[in-house]
């Protein structure tokens, strides 16, 4: 068994091959261009038939390389940067450079057998791109809305009596009328406010167009079980699928929960058994599960009963919600596994 560790960067990638005992076989460094990536893949192929490739930054600087590795049929796992840092600290070889990191990445993969494998599911990759683009538009709209709010406080004091929130087309139309009234006294502020209103309309149209694309891409995926979960609408489902990148990468629901940051971390010592909050994991998935938990806490009787049981056990409201998120991680995992099985059946038919 040969394990290849790759430390990916914007301009160059360092790769190290080790055997099953952790001994270094060979180290290579290549550029990030297409020809250099092909040379790296050819080098990996020549190492033998049984191999595993571990990439740090597989979804970042190493994304182009990872896609080519998957297209070439390689088994690829993603190594989180904190695992590399932990491995480097525990090594007898001190210091840090790309070669040391590549060797460390390979050794991390050797001792961590349950690392999630990467897949070449283009539908999930497209969902992530679309959802990320929409999230950026929504975030920009929030910033523009805040600027407009600050301008309206001077242009139209007390404007909140007429406008509850600067979110709908009707509210923006009312805001425009208020701006026009105060235009003579504050021409510069009025000009900036009108530009902000135009920008909000534009961002809204772009976000709506992306939502249509997201729903279309989601329909091709047919996640019927996932969408049946209370609180999981099209946008949340697309976020979960895009960030998960193939549920079958995770052998168990516990592994998925750990990836989402909803599984508490053991912090026991001696006779004391306790757990602490997990602040790691994929925070986008964690956020999506938080959204589902908040919806269920309001509308799902089973979720409300679950929260009441946790409160009766002595947990605080926040702790009870964390327990619900951990429970929902399993519910979502099971739903995605069921959808994946149905997709395989459809493909085989």
Which residues does each predicted region cover?
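Short alpha-helix plus adjacent loop in nuclease-associated cores
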Residues: 77-117, 125, 129, 136, ...
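Glycine-rich, often acidic, oxyanion-interacting loops/wings at catalytic, nucleic-acid
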Residues: 129-225
């Amino acid at each position: 068994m040969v394990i290849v560790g790759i430390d990916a960067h914007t301009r160059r990638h360092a790769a190290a091959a080790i055997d099953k005992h952790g001994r270094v076989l060979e180290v290579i460094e290549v550029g990030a261009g297409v020809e250099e990536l092909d040379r790296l893949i050819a080098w990996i192929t020549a190492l033998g038939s049984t191999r595993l490739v571990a990439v740090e930054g597989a979804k970042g600087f190493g994304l182009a390389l990872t896609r080519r590795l998957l297209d070439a049929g390689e088994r690829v796992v993603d190594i989180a940067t904190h695992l590399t840092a932990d491995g480097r600290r525990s090594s007898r070889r001190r210091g840090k450079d790309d070669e040391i990191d590549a060797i460390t990445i390979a050794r991390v993969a050797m001792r961590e057998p349950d690392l999630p494998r990467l897949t070449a599911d283009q539908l999930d990759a497209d969902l992530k791109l679309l959802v990320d683009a929409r999230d950026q538009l929504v975030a920009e709209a929030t910033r523009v809305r805040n600027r407009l709010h600050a301008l309206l406080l001077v242009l139209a004091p007390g404007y909140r009596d007429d406008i509850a929130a600067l979110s709908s087309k009707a509210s923006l139309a009312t805001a425009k009328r208020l701006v026009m009234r105060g235009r003579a006294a504050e021409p510069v502020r009025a000009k900036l406010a009108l530009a902000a209103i135009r920008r909000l309309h534009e961002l809204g149209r772009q976000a709506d167009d992306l939502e249509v694309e997201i729903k279309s891409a989601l329909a091709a995926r047919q996640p019927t079980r996932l969408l049946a979960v209370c609180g999981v609408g099209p946008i949340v489902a697309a976020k979960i699928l895009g960030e998960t990148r193939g549920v079958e990468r995770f052998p168990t629901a516990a592994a998925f929960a750990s990836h989402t940051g909803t599984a508490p971390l053991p912090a026991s010592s001696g006779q004391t058994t306790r757990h602490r909050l997990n602040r790691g994991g994929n925070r986008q998935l964690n956020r999506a599960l938080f959204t589902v938990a908040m919806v269920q806490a309001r509308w799902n009787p089973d979720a409300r009963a679950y929260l009441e049981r946790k409160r009766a056990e002595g947990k605080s409201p926040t702790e009870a919600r964390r327990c619900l998120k951990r429970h929902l991680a399993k519910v979502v995992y099971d739903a995605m596994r069921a959808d994946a099985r149905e997709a395989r059946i459809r493909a085989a038919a």
